[in-house]
Amino acid sequence: MNLLIQNGRVIDPSQGLDEELDLLVENGLVREMGRGLTAPAGVEIVDAAGCCVVPGLVDMHVHLREPGLEYKEDIESGSRAAVAGGFTSIACMPNTKPVIDNKALARYVIARGREAGLCNVFPVGCLTAGSKGERLAEMGELKEAGCVAVSDDGRPVVNAELMRRALEYARGMQIPVISHAEDLSLVGEGVMNEGFTSTELGLKGIPRVAEDIAIARDVMLAEYTNSPIHIAHVSTSGAVRIIRNAKLRGVRVTCETAPHYFTLTDDAVRGYNTNAKMNPPLREADDVAAIRAGLSDGTIDVIATDHAPHHLDEKDVEFNVAANGIIGLETSLPLSLALVEQGVLTMSQLVERMSCCPSLILGLERGTLAKGAVADITLIDPTLPWVVEADKLASKSTNTPWMGQEMKGAAVATIVAGRVVYRR
């Protein structure tokens, strides 16, 4: 499919672009960019007036639940949710059933992604065998099979010596390590952020320092081994401070946060709302402010969703036993666009956080509209109003704290390798 995208505001931080331009796509690649381009014969014209034309959004942290947990989500339904949210590439975490700790399962995920035929689906392999934290997984085989990173996401690597060796081996193999950072001895039986609200609700709390201590350890290990490390789902002011200081020292650390951490506080748990239960938990107002400041100054490199679908039966229970996590692929873009409207980020910075940076960290060769690049493109209407409604979500699951709320901004077209896979 060949396309001429006209009249759009092209924003591409990789080239320092933010201006009204036309974009010609031929044979799945960006062929030309300029003003007043003429459509060759047989080219479909896409009118992008009023829209931002950006490199396809990349979500480096999703849970697609396949294999083994398809009652929550599967690769096809997750891919549908991704393209509806404007994502052209997603990286799926390995905490499936069985976990993705061998090349056969990694290849299965890639094959199922291609079968779905919507977005690019990249597997993240386990950091340790069986995700048990006892010995390292076969990183070389996982990379050879197509894994773009390794992680035991969902649980931390408790053994510091094992984490040190993981960082050293991964550095040699040039595969990113994604750290789920929490000190389980401090987490204990906590189910929400420790503070005034947890006390008022009579729920056991998780102190912020549980995250801070674990991140400090992993940052120090990365510094000691001169290895890169990526910290997942940063949620505390202390974590932002630790990572900011580490970057100033030249430590090779990158990190991500998710929209719920710069949008909601633990007040959302009031009423024992299980759709506000996640790990790490929602924090307090000063943490939200710190996350927003970290996004603004570049301490936080990436906005990811941590899309975590769960069946209603796993959420419609007492708060203490409810599953952690919320869906995010279809709500991430409007929640993040609010940062632009509020002056926290420029539109170019937002595209960096949601496309360029995650692509660079994972080595995807995406996140750019440069001539000759793969034509993964998202068209965004930043002012389009819409309401989050269960029957209109593409995901199998509906566990979101924003159900029934009005959003502003959406992807109106998602293009993968020059093919329009979604239109709003």
UniProtKB/Swiss-Prot annotation:
GO terms for molecular function: allantoinase activity; dihydroorotase activity; zinc ion binding. SUPFAM superfamilies: Composite domain of metallo-dependent hydrolases, Metallo-dependent hydrolases. Keywords: Hydrolase, Metal-binding, Pyrimidine biosynthesis, Zinc. It comes from the Bacteria. GO terms for biological process: 'de novo' UMP biosynthetic process; purine nucleobase catabolic process. Zn(2+) 1 binds at residues 61, 63, 153, 306. It is an enzyme of class 3 (hydrolase). Substrate binds at residues 63-65, 95, 279, 310. GO terms for cellular component: cytoplasm. The keyword Nucleotide-binding does not apply. CDD domains: DHOase_IIa (cd01317). Zn(2+) 2 binds at residues 153, 180, 233. Its EC number is 3.5.2.3. Transmembrane segments: none annotated. Binds 2 Zn(2+) ions per subunit. Its cofactor is Zn(2+). Pathway: Pyrimidine metabolism; UMP biosynthesis via de novo pathway; (S)-dihydroorotate from bicarbonate: step 3/3. The active site is at 306. It catalyses: (S)-dihydroorotate + H2O = N-carbamoyl-L-aspartate + H(+). Catalyzes the reversible cyclization of carbamoyl aspartate to dihydroorotate. NCBIfam families: pyrC_multi. Belongs to the metallo-dependent hydrolases superfamily. DHOase family. Class I DHOase subfamily. PANTHER family: ALLANTOINASE (PTHR43668:SF2). This is Dihydroorotase. It comes from Pelobacter propionicus (strain DSM 2379 / NBRC 103807 / OttBd1).
